[in-house]
């Protein structure tokens, strides 16, 4: 079977075997094949019955195999015995040729495979060579770069070395610098101190060495033994004394600690009590301050009222003196008892004329008993207070329009002095007493100022419980109580100078709008819408308490 007639499956094991075969073995196989072919040819030509060597892949069977394969045909052999030797020779020759051709084909195929392998190896080697060349070029380039860097580093190193040398040369002290350092007083002082310390240490060292040499003794000496025994005894005594002192000190310290603890507890208690007391004192002080503030405000209001009353009294005295001078002049009439009409009072005169002193009014009545000229209508006109819907209306007598127009100025002035009308408020309850000698009725337009204390926290344990502060609600209650008391007492709106003594002191203090009752006996209360006088009850109550204390009575209780 030739190589061309073999399939690819048959050729693949041969190719694998030749790929694995080495070059020396391949040449050895070729030599064996050539030698076997030559020996087979020579044997076939001489003997004609030799068995040629079979190749590794010869598919044709040999002569012996054919004899074994056909034992059951004996009838063919004795029919063709005369043709057998020639045919066997030809067959052997053909087999040898085929074997030679197969060997040659195998050798050619192996050579071709080897050539292909070598070509592939050459290509790979070329590629490897190119790659190695590139690697070598890169390595050379890196080497050059590193060499350049190394040169730069060496240059920098040399520069640094030269700089260090220069710095050392600069820092090296010269002889002149050393001399100046030695001449420096601070350095000299330092050297002197070092010398003194060195001398002192040397002397101490010598002393200690001398003492050590003096105290040295041998172990067998009696002096050393006695000294050691004495030292042990002293050491034991020292330990015992230390224990005793430590125990005694501990007990003492424990007692002192207990005493300090008890003292600290007492101090804490006293401090807490002191804090409570201080808090109470603060509350009491706040209450006192509020009370003082309220009293100061009341004092201020009373002083203001006193000043205004003094001014009013001075004005009234001046007006009274003028009236006396006018009244002393003889009145002129037209032959009748009718008086000339008085002039209408101006607002300026009305504002200036206010309550008149009682003594001055009495003196004027005693000096001039006939100053009314026998006309009782003027008394009624002065005593009666007509109700008016408009507050501050000027009330004039009925005979203003019917009076004689021929009266002179002196008569008008006298009449004006005797029949002066004042500004009054509207009243609902009108009290008309029996006709008495009239006094000048003057009404003072005063306003009751109510001062309320600031609201503060009530003290816990205040000692000022007898003097609590007043609030607006308490003031209203006191005013209401004073109004009820004043309503029970029939106080006329127009009082005569002689009737003022019939009113009790407390009722007049409640009913009067001002403090004029303290200074004079004339009382001219202010009329309200209800006909009840609403005076400053707080001030009157305090005045009553002051009078009661002066008379021997107890203080007034403000707590109700």
From Swiss-Prot:
<comment type="similarity">
    <text>Belongs to the fl(2)d family.</text>
</comment>
<dbReference type="GO" id="GO:0006397">
    <property type="term" value="P:mRNA processing"/>
</dbReference>
<feature type="compositionally biased region" description="Gly residues">
    <location>
        <begin position="42"/>
        <end position="52"/>
    </location>
</feature>
<feature type="region of interest" description="Disordered">
    <location>
        <begin position="316"/>
        <end position="352"/>
    </location>
</feature>
<keyword id="KW-0507">mRNA processing</keyword>
<feature type="compositionally biased region" description="Basic residues">
    <location>
        <begin position="69"/>
        <end position="83"/>
    </location>
</feature>
<protein>
    <recommendedName>
        <fullName>Pre-mRNA-splicing regulator female-lethal(2)D</fullName>
    </recommendedName>
</protein>
<feature type="region of interest" description="Disordered">
    <location>
        <begin position="541"/>
        <end position="560"/>
    </location>
</feature>
<feature type="compositionally biased region" description="Polar residues">
    <location>
        <begin position="331"/>
        <end position="349"/>
    </location>
</feature>
<keyword id="KW-0175">Coiled coil</keyword>
<feature type="compositionally biased region" description="Basic and acidic residues">
    <location>
        <begin position="316"/>
        <end position="325"/>
    </location>
</feature>
<feature type="compositionally biased region" description="Polar residues">
    <location>
        <begin position="375"/>
        <end position="387"/>
    </location>
</feature>
<comment type="subunit">
    <text>Component of the WMM complex, a N6-methyltransferase complex composed of a catalytic subcomplex, named MAC, and of an associated subcomplex, named MACOM. The MAC subcomplex is composed of Ime4/Mettl3 and Mettl14. The MACOM subcomplex is composed of fl(2)d, Flacc/Xio, Hakai, vir, and, in some cases of nito. Interacts with vir and msk. Part of a complex containing fl(2)d, Sxl and vir.</text>
</comment>
<feature type="coiled-coil region">
    <location>
        <begin position="87"/>
        <end position="218"/>
    </location>
</feature>
<dbReference type="GO" id="GO:0000375">
    <property type="term" value="P:RNA splicing, via transesterification reactions"/>
</dbReference>
<dbReference type="GO" id="GO:0030154">
    <property type="term" value="P:cell differentiation"/>
</dbReference>
<keyword id="KW-0217">Developmental protein</keyword>
<keyword id="KW-0508">mRNA splicing</keyword>
<dbReference type="GO" id="GO:0007548">
    <property type="term" value="P:sex differentiation"/>
</dbReference>
<feature type="coiled-coil region">
    <location>
        <begin position="262"/>
        <end position="324"/>
    </location>
</feature>
<keyword id="KW-0539">Nucleus</keyword>
<keyword id="KW-0221">Differentiation</keyword>
<keyword id="KW-0726">Sexual differentiation</keyword>
<feature type="region of interest" description="Disordered">
    <location>
        <begin position="371"/>
        <end position="413"/>
    </location>
</feature>
<dbReference type="GO" id="GO:0005634">
    <property type="term" value="C:nucleus"/>
</dbReference>
<feature type="compositionally biased region" description="Low complexity">
    <location>
        <begin position="87"/>
        <end position="107"/>
    </location>
</feature>
<dbReference type="InterPro" id="IPR033757">
    <property type="entry name" value="WTAP"/>
</dbReference>
<feature type="compositionally biased region" description="Polar residues">
    <location>
        <begin position="547"/>
        <end position="560"/>
    </location>
</feature>
<dbReference type="GO" id="GO:0016556">
    <property type="term" value="P:mRNA modification"/>
</dbReference>
<feature type="region of interest" description="Disordered">
    <location>
        <begin position="35"/>
        <end position="107"/>
    </location>
</feature>
<dbReference type="GO" id="GO:0000381">
    <property type="term" value="P:regulation of alternative mRNA splicing, via spliceosome"/>
</dbReference>
<comment type="function">
    <text>Associated component of the WMM complex, a complex that mediates N6-methyladenosine (m6A) methylation of mRNAs, a modification that plays a role in the efficiency of mRNA splicing and is required for sex determination. Required for sex determination and dosage compensation via Sxl alternative splicing: m6A methylation acts as a key regulator of Sxl pre-mRNA and promotes female-specific alternative splicing of Sxl, which determines female physiognomy. M6A methylation is also required for neuronal functions.</text>
</comment>
<dbReference type="Pfam" id="PF17098">
    <property type="entry name" value="Wtap"/>
</dbReference>
